[in-house]
């Protein structure tokens, strides 16, 4: 918003400078008009041909003044248009600079995120390798537990069989001793 007010103030200041500059020359135009009027009155008295030439010059002078005013107006409009264009260019350059900085920032962020993804992928690979190793170890341990359970079961069965056998032998020995003691 301040750029618009600065721009408007700048235009008004330039127009004031131009108007002051033209006002300096207005006394010359007035002096010229007075001289031309004096010349006309002198010429009318002395010579009618000079009067025609004077009128011609006066018309030409008036036409030149009108042309000058038209050119001045056109110059002012062109100056205003040029200043608007300059302002727009400056705004676009600022916007472009901001966008370039934002783009650079986003590119840096993308690079950092890509590096982070690479590191996370490495970590995931390591975790997958460790998980696979743990699964292998678990399978080996489960196999060992199964084998040891089977072996333990067989040992218990063998021990029970041996205990049965020993108990039967003991029973037989006790029966024998009892039968010997009875006799």
UniProtKB/Swiss-Prot annotation:
Membrane topology note: Peripheral membrane protein
Tagged with keyword Protein transport: yes
UniProt entry keywords in alphabetical sequence: Autophagy, Coiled coil, Membrane, Protein transport, Transport
Record keyword Membrane present: yes
Compartment(s): Preautophagosomal structure membrane
Gene3D superfamilies: 1.20.5.170
InterPro entries, alphabetized: Autophagy-rel_prot_16_dom
Coiled coil: 44-183
GO BP: autophagy; protein transport
Segments crossing the lipid bilayer: none
Entries under Pfam families matching the protein: ATG16 (PF08614)
Gene Ontology cellular-component terms listed: phagophore assembly site membrane
Family of this protein: Belongs to the ATG16 family.
Assembly information from the UniProt record: Homodimer. Part of the ATG5-ATG12/ATG16 complex. Several units of each may be present in this complex.
Its job: Stabilizes the ATG5-ATG12 conjugate which is necessary for autophagy. The ATG5-ATG12/ATG16 complex is required for efficient promotion of ATG8-conjugation to phosphatidylethanolamine and ATG8 localization to the pre-autophagosomal structure (PAS). Also recruits ATG3 to the PAS. Involved in endoplasmic reticulum-specific autophagic process and is essential for the survival of cells subjected to severe ER stress.
Protein's recorded name: Autophagy protein 16
Native source species: Debaryomyces hansenii (strain ATCC 36239 / CBS 767 / BCRC 21394 / JCM 1990 / NBRC 0083 / IGC 2968)
Gene that produces this protein: ATG16
């Amino acid at each position: 918003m301040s750029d618009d007010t600065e721009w408007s103030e700048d235009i008004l200041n330039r127009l004031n400078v131009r108007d002051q500059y033209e006002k300096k020359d207005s006394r010359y135009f007035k002096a010229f008009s007075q001289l031309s009027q004096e010349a006309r009155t002198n010429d009318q008295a002395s010579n009618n041909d000079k009067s025609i030439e004077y009128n011609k010059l006066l018309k030409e002078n008036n036409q030149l003044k009108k042309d000058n005013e038209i050119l001045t107006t056109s110059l002012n409009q062109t100056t205003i248009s040029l200043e608007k264009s300059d302002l727009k260019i400056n705004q676009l350059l600022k916007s472009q600079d901001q966008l370039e900085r934002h783009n650079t920032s986003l590119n840096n962020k993308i690079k950092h995120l890509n590096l982070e993804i690479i590191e996370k992928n490495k970590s995931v690979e390591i975790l997958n390798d460790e998980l696979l190793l743990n699964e292998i170890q678990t399978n080996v341990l489960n196999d060992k537990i199964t084998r040891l359970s089977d072996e333990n079961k067989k040992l218990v069965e063998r021990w029970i069989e041996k205990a049965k056998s020993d108990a039967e032998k003991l029973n037989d020995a006790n029966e024998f001793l009892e039968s010997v003691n009875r006799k």
